[in-house]
Amino acid sequence: MPAFDIVSEVDNVELKNAVDNATRELATRFDFRGVDASFELKGENIKIKAEDDFQLTQLVDILRGNLAKRGVDARSMDVKDAVHSGKNFYQDIDFKQGIDPLISKKLVKEIKASKVKVQAAIQGEQLRITGKNRDDLQAAMAIVREGDFGQPFQFTNFRD
């Protein structure tokens, strides 16, 4: 029976490359000359530091652009509020890994409401979709792509 998995993951290598590119771009920007600003990557968390709140938003925009260039979907970013400490502003950005249980229930509900002849099963932080033929699975993929669930999804482990 054909099946595939729906997952929501961020490629850590591409994330590191995007942060490195953003750091390089930061070094060449004229408006950041002589400014104490930086990106720091720890696991799936990025800590941004700048001297001004406006510069912090500029750094987030630089990071979003570099993430897009590297193929990392910006919807997986969870931007926290800016914190002012001393003369610097700090902001944490987390990246969502895995599908939240509430979102996975919404996905299952949406797929079942579409009357496509597939079965959806929640398996931890991923979803397994099984069906009788490939066309039904591709219809389920289209439903997931069209829906706005607030995070990006990848389709893996496609079996015939």
Curated annotation (Swiss-Prot):
UniProt-listed InterPro entries: DUF520 (IPR007551), UPF0234-like_C (IPR035571), UPF0234_N (IPR035570), YajQ-like_sf (IPR036183)
CDD domains listed in its UniProt record: YajQ_like (cd11740)
Keyword Membrane: no
UniProt xrefs under Pfam families: DUF520
GO MF assignments: nucleotide binding
UniProt entry tagged with the keyword Signal: no
Coiled-coil segments on the chain, per record: none
A GO cellular component entry from the record: cytosol
Keyword field: Nucleotide-binding
Family: Belongs to the YajQ family.
Protein task: Nucleotide-binding protein.
Protein name per its UniProtKB record: Nucleotide-binding protein VSAL_I1728
Native source species: Aliivibrio salmonicida (strain LFI1238)
